[in-house]
Amino acid sequence: MIQTESRLKVADNSGAKELLTIRVLGGSSRKFAGIGDIVVATVKSAAPGGAVKKGEVVKAVIVRTKSGAKRPDGSYIKFDENAAVLIRDDKTPRGTRIFGPVARELREGGYMKIVSLAPEVL
C-alpha cells in the first residue's frame, strides 16, 4: 500500500527516476493507494534533459506494489518494488515507453495506453 511520504520508482521514460507521494486522490480521508490508483507526487530525482525536472509536482498511477493486490479468483499478485507511471489529466502516460511488468488491474481502471505500452502484463 502506498501512502503519503512513500517513495516510488518511475517505470517510464518521462525523465523522472524517483517520486515522493504527496497525496492519495479519491476522497479527503483516503490514506492508502493500491495498483491502479492515482497519487500526487513530487519528483525527487530526474535524468538530465528529461521532460520533467526535480521538484516538479506530477500525477502518477501506481503500476506495481510490494504489498500487491488480491484477485477475484483468490490469488495475489506481488512485485519486488513500488513503481508508478506519470500521467496527464486525461489518464494518458507522459512517457512513450513503460519499463517492467504491470498488473492486469490497470485494464479495468481504464489505462489501456499504459497496458499496451507495457512489455508484460501480469
Swiss-Prot record:
Record-linked SMART domains: Ribosomal_L14
Gene3D superfamilies: Ribosomal protein L14
Top-level taxon of origin: Bacteria
CDD domains tied to this protein: Ribosomal_uL14 (cd00337)
InterPro entries for the chain: Ribosomal_uL14, Ribosomal_uL14_bac-type, Ribosomal_uL14_CS, Ribosomal_uL14_sf
PROSITE patterns given in the database record: RIBOSOMAL_L14
One Pfam family named in its UniProt record: Ribosomal_L14
One GO biological process term: translation
MF annotations from Gene Ontology: large ribosomal subunit rRNA binding; structural constituent of ribosome
Keywords tagged on the record: Ribonucleoprotein, Ribosomal protein, RNA-binding, rRNA-binding
GO cellular component: a single term: cytosolic large ribosomal subunit
Subunit (UniProt): Part of the 50S ribosomal subunit. Forms a cluster with proteins L3 and L19. In the 70S ribosome, L14 and L19 interact and together make contacts with the 16S rRNA in bridges B5 and B8.
Family: Belongs to the universal ribosomal protein uL14 family.
Function: Binds to 23S rRNA. Forms part of two intersubunit bridges in the 70S ribosome.
Protein name per the record: Large ribosomal subunit protein uL14
